[in-house]
Amino acid sequence: MSLTPRQLGEQLRQRKQRRQPIAVLTAWDALSASWAEAAGVDLVLVGDSLAMVALGHATTLPVTLEAMVQHTAAVERGLRHTPIVSDLPFLSYQCGPDQAVAAAGRFLKETGCAGVKLEGGEPETIAVIDRLVRSGIPVMGHLGLTPQSVHQLGYRRQATDPVAQERLWQRALELQQTGCFALVLEHVPAELATRLSAELSVPVIGIGAGEGCDGQVRVSADLLGLTPQQPPFSPALLDGRELFSQALRQWVQGVQSAPVPPANHSAPHC
């Protein structure tokens, strides 16, 4: 990558200061990475959503650290200059700072990514982020709807009452103070996200959090209409499933309807 981890954080902060919206797309392999870069994104996120998009799981929970490292390396090979941030998957950092440093270190050493993303803002997570940052590993935070907590919180909208909003606000401030270079806010009220974006000095990247954030992130497969179920806050821009299926169906039907060539037209045996 052309940007070092430190340069990535500085570049994103400069875009925030200049009020230049930040565009982030996910990728899960070299091909999807090349699509994102051709579109001109500022940052590629290798999200643990690849568990659902590429590996067929119902949630993000089953994806392993090994799989995330492998897919992140593939994404890196599909890019020329766009920086990468990768998700630390479920149970790769929840056991404590030592585990988190070992896991995050693999991404920086083996994949060329510029940082990692962690979900949550509980005291235990803050301690993990503090250790990562002090170890020289850039961290992007993630609050609101956190898919790794699906069994506790579900996929419903988060921070919808004053108590929950105050808790999210304080956690966002803690993440910034601990050293996160950016923050993802997912599926929270737009007014709250707008106020937080104005309050924080680090960029706030929204998904389902309104248009008042410093940038937006989307799962590429959702935008392309490739996933069977669309999140309500991430509508598709085209019906990719139907377009791809139609093209493949046309080829299959052409093969199946073609006349079988006579035996003497087959290639000679060597």
Swiss-Prot record:
Stored InterPro entries: Pantoate_hydroxy_MeTrfase, Pyrv/PenolPyrv_kinase-like_dom, Pyrv_kinase-like_dom_sf
Catalysed reactions, as listed in the record: 3-methyl-2-oxobutanoate + (6R)-5,10-methylene-5,6,7,8-tetrahydrofolate + H2O = 2-dehydropantoate + (6S)-5,6,7,8-tetrahydrofolate
Active site location: 186
EC number, UniProt record: 2.1.2.11
SUPFAM superfamilies: Phosphoenolpyruvate/pyruvate domain
Pathway stated in the Swiss-Prot or TrEMBL entry: Cofactor biosynthesis; (R)-pantothenate biosynthesis; (R)-pantoate from 3-methyl-2-oxobutanoate: step 1/2
Enzyme's top EC category: transferase
A single MF term (Gene Ontology): 3-methyl-2-oxobutanoate hydroxymethyltransferase activity
Principal place of residence: cytoplasm
UniProt-annotated location(s): Cytoplasm
Positions annotated to bind Mg(2+): 48, 87, 119
Required co-factors: Mg(2+)
GO biological processes: pantothenate biosynthetic process
Domain of life: Bacteria
Binding of 3-methyl-2-oxobutanoate, residues: 48-49, 87, 117
Keyword match Signal: no
Family: Belongs to the PanB family.
Annotated function: Catalyzes the reversible reaction in which hydroxymethyl group from 5,10-methylenetetrahydrofolate is transferred onto alpha-ketoisovalerate to form ketopantoate.
Subunit comment: Homodecamer; pentamer of dimers.
Protein name: 3-methyl-2-oxobutanoate hydroxymethyltransferase
Gene, per the UniProt record: panB
